[in-house]
């Protein structure tokens, strides 16, 4: 090997080492910072999962007690016979009827039949009605 080739090889090796040290000086702090934040994310995820499971367990333990308390309170209330309750289906039909009644006065009121009102015999309906 000649002196010139050894010198050029050492020059390339020196340049490589300088670039390596410079890149390491820039990348290593960023890599350490990234590792720190990634550890924080994993730790927060773990704590979030544990707190969720703890809250879910507390909820599951409290739900039967709450239901029994509400049922006991409801048992002490007198039934309201004078108030007519409207099912959501009937309320929706009522709203639809009033919506169409504003635009067209020929729309008929919907007929709502509950299960107890259905007759056991067949009713014949004529077309002229």
Swiss-Prot record:
Recorded GO CC terms: membrane
Coiled-coil segments: none
Sequence ranges on the Extracellular membrane side: 22-24
Membrane topology: Multi-pass membrane protein
Keywords, in A-Z order: Membrane, Sporulation, Transmembrane, Transmembrane helix
TM spans (from-to): 2-21, 25-47
UniProt entry tagged with the keyword Transmembrane: yes
GO biological process, one term: sporulation resulting in formation of a cellular spore
Cytoplasmic-side segments: 1, 48-129
Domain of life: Eukaryota
Subcellular location, record wording: Membrane
Primary role: Involved in spore wall assembly.
Family: Belongs to the OSW5 family.
Descriptive protein name: Outer spore wall protein 5
UniProt source species: Lachancea thermotolerans (strain ATCC 56472 / CBS 6340 / NRRL Y-8284)
């Amino acid at each position: 090997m000649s002196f010139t080739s050894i010198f050029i090889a050492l020059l390339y090796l020196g340049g490589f080492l300088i670039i390596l040290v410079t890149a390491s000086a820039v990348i290593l702090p960023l890599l350490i910072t990234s590792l720190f934040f990634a550890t924080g994310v994993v730790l927060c995820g773990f704590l979030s999962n544990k707190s969720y499971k703890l809250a879910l367990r507390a909820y599951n333990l409290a739900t039967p007690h709450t239901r029994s308390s509400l049922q006991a309170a409801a048992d002490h209330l007198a039934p309201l016979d004078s108030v007519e309750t409207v099912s959501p289906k009937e309320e929706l039909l009522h709203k639809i009827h009033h919506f169409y009644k504003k635009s067209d006065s020929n729309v008929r009121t919907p007929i709502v039949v509950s299960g107890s009102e259905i007759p056991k015999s067949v009713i014949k309906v004529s077309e002229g009605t």
